Amino acid sequence: MKVSYKLDLSELPRITRKMQDELYRELKQNVQQAAQGVSVQAKQSAPRDKRVGHGGDLHRSIYYRVKDLTGEVGVGMPYGPYQDFGTGNKVVVPPGWEKYAMQFKGAGIRNVNMTPQPFFYPAVNVHETKFNNECEKSISKVMTKRR
C-alpha cells in the first residue's frame, strides 16, 4: 500500500497575479473610502461661523487625495491645529496625538488660551479603525476565494 502526492504548480503564477490584482483593487478602494470619510466627517465637524452660516476658509481647506495605495487628508489653513487642539492652558491632548498636540500647550508670549473645537483628529480616529477592519476583510476575502 502506498500514497503519492504530486503538486502541479504550473497555474501558480497566474493565480497569484490574479490575487494580487484583486487585492490591489480592494485595498485601493479601502484607502479611497477612508480618506474621503475622514474629509467628510472633518468638514461636518469643523467649527462654523454662526454669523454667516457656513464653515468658511477652514471648512473649505479640508482636502483629501488618493494615489495608488496612499491616501492623504489635510487641513490647508495654518490655524487648523489650534482649532482642533486648543492653545495655551486649554490644550487637549488626545491619546495617540501627544507628540503633535503638545506643541500648542504652555505659556507663550501672549496669553491666548483658545478652547479646542476638535474636528480633525476625531474623524481620523474613527476612520482609522474602520480602515484597518476593512483591510482585514479585504485580505481575508481575496485569500479565501476559490480559484
Model-derived regions, located:
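Short, Lys/Arg-rich flexible segments
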Residues: M1-G80, V92-R147
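Short intrinsically disordered coil segments
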Residues: G88-K90
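Short, conserved beta-strand/beta-arch hydrophobic-aromatic motifs that form part
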Residues: Q83-G86
